[in-house]
Amino acid sequence: MINERKVWSPVGWGLLAGVLLIPLAGAERAAKIAGAVALAAVLWRLAHRGPAARGLARTGVVLNLIRGRALTAVSANRGPWLLVGAVTLAAGPLALNNYVLDVLALAWLYVVLALGLQITVGFTGLLDLGYAAFYAMGAYGYALASTRFGVSFWVGLPLGALLAAACGVLLGVVTLRLRGDYLAIVTLGFIQIVHLVLNNWDSVTNGPNGILHVGRPQLGSLVFTDPIHFYYLTLGVAIVAILINTRVQSSRIGRAWMAIRDDEIAAEAMGVPTTRLKVLAFASGAAWAGVAGVCFAGKYAFVSPESFTFFESIVILAMVVLGGMSSIPGVVIGAVVIVVVPELLRGVQDYRMLVFGAALVFMMTVRPEGLVRRGLSKRRPGAAAA
């Protein structure tokens, strides 16, 4: 006998998804997405009801998106959410207009940037106010390589990452003995220097006019020009960044970074190579900024100094702080919120940034640890009592 609660639960999630997406997608497209979410939830229910039903559900297109070890690697509680999320991310864009797709592609781009800064600020505790400089390195590096030497986007991705990582190593070596306010001041000076160079080195960067006609990504004869192309591109890069950061966070290097963040002197006394790991943190975080910079240049086919300012660094830092310094899901949520919410408030154009800023201040006042706290769900029941 079918449990009515199990039938209505998927429908409820579908309705919730539809209502939340109406401001972005419109009623008709939101209804389509709600149906896709409800279908994914129903298939998940079927997957837990007998051998025949499991076989039917597993042959569906939805479950094929995350088949294999992805299903067995997650807990029973997270499985349905992962499935619904995968279907929504993969199929949802087909029902969205170009404006919404462009906003979401930008959101995924900022997810990559926020995850990179999280390595430096969240994992290692090194306050970097000049992170947008590495973003600029990747973008300008690829723009110059593309326009002057005809380098393709796919070759430019690792080149941009390496260039930004090299600059990260340089900054890490210079700031080895600095922490806190002093480190913040030096990194602030770094972004200002980079911005001045980009604005005034006309023979290379074309000054404030920027660089035009940057090569777009291309697969065979398919040139990425539509917003949906860049949605899937940035989503793919963001997923790779999430997976790598998750593995790194739980690795020996990740634990050593967090030991440095908590108490650098104690970590060094315990044999942690703090010097090498701090430089590695700068390089790793910068590499993700370089990748994001290449994606940015390929998406817009144009770069200019005004895209890489100190304000950009602050926005990325706000994403990390809002989401939760050590929480990867929190940083992802923080990045998406900070990109998407101002667009939702365009109806009150004159006050949208005021409303958004007030909401951020309120959020950080009532929940200073961020939207998501790492490890909260893993605490044992008796931990609180103890």
Report the location of each language-model feature:
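Transmembrane alpha-helices and adjacent helix-loop boundaries
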Residues: 2-386
